[in-house]
Regions:
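PLP-dependent class I/II
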Residues: 1-135
Length: 135
């Protein structure tokens, strides 16, 4: 019986939350769009300034950055080194592809502006702090 309660039907609190969200006015969602567009633009401008090639998301809150120039065969290893040496967290892009893709990492930009600015300041020095492989 407990199994039925956990797997059949949506939980009542989640249904109430969904109704609340559906009743928000258009201005709320327009404000969210403006906020996240602004954060995206800030982050992409910083990546551009740091010379880090990247995708331009059209609706997602993350960006894929190309790490090919660093020579790592493993995006996981690169992410570990990036966190340790540069102090910036990223997710290996290979986590999101069926194919063997190891030259992309994913950054999440739905953060406080101050957090993004701090990360971008660190990424400005990525070529000095993250060792290159195979050179």
């Amino acid at each position: 019986m407990a199994h039925d309660f956990l797997t059949v039907g949506a939980a009542a609190p989640l249904q109430e939350a969904a109704v609340t969200a559906l009743n928000f006015g258009d201005e709320y969602y327009k404000g969210l769009q403006e906020k996240y567009t602004s954060l995206r633009n800030l982050f992409l401008a910083g990546l551009d300034q740091a010379g880090i090639p990247h995708t331009t998301p059209q609706g997602a809150y993350y960006v894929l950055a190309d790490i090919s120039e660093f020579g790592y065969k493993s995006d996981l290893e690169f992410c570990e080194v990036l966190a340790e040496k540069c102090g910036v967290g990223a997710v290996p892009g290979s986590s999101f592809f069926r194919e063997n893709v190891n030259h992309l990492i994913r950054f999440h930009f739905a953060k406080k502006e101050s957090t993004l600015s701090a990360a971008l300041e660190r990424l400005m020095h990525i070529r000095e702090t993250v060792p290159f492989k195979g050179r």
